[in-house]
């Protein structure tokens, strides 16, 4: 993929937070991160809790302080934008969070939730209502869903509503922050398939943040693995999730559960052997 086709370019980005105390150095959450996301591409960002993967998503959204390097969107530096410029950019960059229930206003109907971002940007009520009908159809929810409240839906259905809201203004990039981790396995699969279906139809790009290598294997074109604020491995999704070169990625792969109890037992033994081998190498 050429540079002209890159939608997002993350170039040597650092994110630091001040630490209370006299002359204490700031906490560096991200260190020299470089990554690209192409138009219509899904890049999976995987790592354990505290690895910095969510912070990178927040940096793209303008919610984390970039203290070094820069983030470019369609060739334009966005890591230094002010609030007003950021608001204008929200048409092109949207987000889907982990817990749809907390990200949806419980007092608003689905119709109000989906029309709000359209009406505030000048869309007429008639066009907004038409767009909502289309959005509900795109995420496979019934037409009468618009009259109901978020609490009347299952977790998977609520996440479909959150996806519909993110799609309402036809974004070019959606940052997906652990969007299926709160769902059961069967629902995860249907929501992941929905993300793929939407991408095939619209050409939207995803940064897919997760701790689960099996999820990124299912949905991603490329994968970047994060550990302690740095990218330790990146490459083609099939390669990284099957034959990783970094010990940390190998550990993540062995930690992922599998439904077959025999394979799970084998993986458990492989994990123990790998841990013993790593300890011996360190010693």
Spans of model-derived segments:
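ABC transporter nucleotide-binding domains
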Residues: 1-255, 267-283
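Proline-centered turn/helix-capping motifs that create local helix->coil transitions or kinks
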Residues: 260-264
